[in-house]
C-alpha cells in the first residue's frame, strides 16, 4: 500500500520528518542562550581557522600592559564576586564543571562579560602554560590605591593592621602575603613602586583570589611612607631573624604596621631604622630564617590571637 513503510523492501529516505514523534522542544534555542558574543573564527573548535591555530607552534602570546589574565577557579570567582571589571572569561573545552565554574559563568553573563569556550591548547598559550584549571579571566591592570587611602581605610576600623614589603621580588610571595593579610583581618599592603613584585596573574593565583578584597598601595619612597604612618599613630614593627624583641613579647593590640624584608636580604638599612622595634620569631633547630610569606603569616596569626582576647 502507498505509504506503508513496513512492507518488504521499503526504505525511508534520510532527512525526512515523516514518523517523527518528538520535536526539539526549543532545545536548539535554549542551547544558544547565555553564551555571549560569537567568538572569532580562530576560537571556534570546528572552524578551519581554529584548526590552523591549534596546529601552529606553541609560542607564548605577546602580552601588553593593557590587560592581565587571572587564572584558576577561586581567583576568577573572587574577582567576579568583587566586581572587578573584566573583558572576557575563557573556559577550556571539556573542562569539568563544578559550583565555582558555574557561578563564574553566571556572574560573567549577568554583567555582560564575553564568555568564550576555547580549546585547552589555546588557553595554555595565553596563560604561558601556567596552571589555569580550565578557566581564565581577562581583566585590566590591577588598580593600586594611594598609601594615604590605605591608612584612612585602616583607621576607620581600628585597631589598624597594615603590612609593608621591603625587597620582596617574587610575586608568589606577594600573593601568599595578600592571602595571609585577608585571613587575619589585615587592612592592606604597601609595596615600593620600584624593585618590587607587583600584583600580576601569578600573585592573583597565589592569593587564591584574596587580591580582589585586600587593597595594595605603591610608595615611591617606602621609608617616607612609614614615617607618615608613624606620625599618624601606627607603631612600625620590622621582622628580622636577629630582631631585638621576641614575637612572644610583642603587644599586638596597638595599631600596627608590620614590615617584612626578603629572606635573603632582610630589611634594608633605612627601613630598619624607620621601625619602632624589630621582632624575631623564636625557632627551634638549625633553621635561621623563614620565607617572607611564612613569617608574615606567623606574626599576623599571633596579632590576631591577641586581638581576640
Curated annotation (Swiss-Prot):
A Pfam family the protein falls into: SpoU_methylase
Gene Ontology CC, one term: cytosol
Lineage: superkingdom: Bacteria
InterPro entries: Alpha/beta_knot_MTases, Ribosomal_eL30-like_sf, rRNA_MeTrfase_TrmH, SpoU_MeTrfase, SpoU_subst-bd, tRNA_m1G_MTases_N
Record: residues binding S-adenosyl-L-methionine: 261, 281, 290
Gene3D superfamilies per the UniProt record, alphabetical: 3.30.1330.30, 3.40.1280.10
Keywords annotated in UniProt: Methyltransferase, S-adenosyl-L-methionine, Transferase
E.C. designation(s): 2.1.1.-
UniProt GO MF annotations: RNA binding; RNA methyltransferase activity
Region Disordered, residue ranges: 1-69
Family named by the database record: Belongs to the class IV-like SAM-binding methyltransferase superfamily. RNA methyltransferase TrmH family.
Descriptive protein name: Uncharacterized tRNA/rRNA methyltransferase ML0324
Amino acid at each position: 500500500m502507498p505509504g506503508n513503510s513496513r512492507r518488504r523492501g521499503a526504505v525511508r529516505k534520510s532527512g525526512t520528518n515523516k514518523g517523527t514523534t518528538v520535536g526539539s522542544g526549543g532545545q536548539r534555542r535554549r542551547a544558544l542562550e547565555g553564551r555571549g558574543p560569537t567568538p572569532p573564527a580562530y576560537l571556534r573548535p570546528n572552524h578551519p581557522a581554529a584548526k590552523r591555530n591549534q596546529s601552529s607552534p606553541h609560542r607564548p602570546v605577546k602580552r601588553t600592559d593593557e590587560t592581565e589574565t587571572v587564572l584558576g577557579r577561586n581567583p576568577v570567582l573572587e574577582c567576579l564576586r568583587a566586581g572587578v571589571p573584566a573583558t572576557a572569561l575563557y573556559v577550556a573545552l571539556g573542562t569539568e564543571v563544578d559550583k565555582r565554574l558555574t557561578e563564574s559563568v553566571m556572574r560573567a553573563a549577568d554583567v555582560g562579560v564575553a564568555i568564550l569556550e576555547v580549546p585547552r591548547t589555546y588557553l595554555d598559550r595565553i596563560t604561558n602554560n601556567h596552571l589555569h584549571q580550565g578557566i581564565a579571566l581577562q581583566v585590566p591592570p590591577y588598580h593600586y590605591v594611594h598609601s594615604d587611602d590605605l591608612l584612612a581605610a585602616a583607621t576607620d576600623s581600628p585597631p589598624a593592621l597594615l603590612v609593608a614589603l621591603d625587597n620582596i621580588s617574587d610575586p608568589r610571595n606577594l600573593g601568599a602575603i595578600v592571602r595571609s593579610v585577608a585571613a587575619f583581618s589585615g587592612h592592606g599592603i604597601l609595596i615600593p613602586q620600584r624593585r618590587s613584585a607587583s600584583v600580576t596573574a601569578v600573585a592573583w593565583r597565589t592569593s587564591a583570589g584574596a587580591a580582589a578584597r585586600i587593597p595594595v598601595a605603591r610608595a615611591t619612597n617606602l621609608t617616607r611612607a612609614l614615617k607618615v604612618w608613624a606620625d599618624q599613630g601606627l607603631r612600625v614593627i620590622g621582622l628580622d631573624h636577629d630582631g631585638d624583641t621576641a614575637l612572644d613579647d610583642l603587644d599586638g593590640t596597638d595599631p600596627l604596621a608590620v614590615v617584612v624584608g626578603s629572606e635573603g636580604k632582610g630589611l634594608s638599612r633605612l627601613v630598619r631604622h624607620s621601625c619602632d622595634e624589630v621582632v624575631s620569631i623564636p625557632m627551634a633547630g638549625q633553621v635561621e630564617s623563614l620565607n617572607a610569606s611564612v613569617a608574615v603569616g606567623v606574626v599576623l596569626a599571633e596579632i590576631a590571637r591577641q586581638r581576640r582576647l
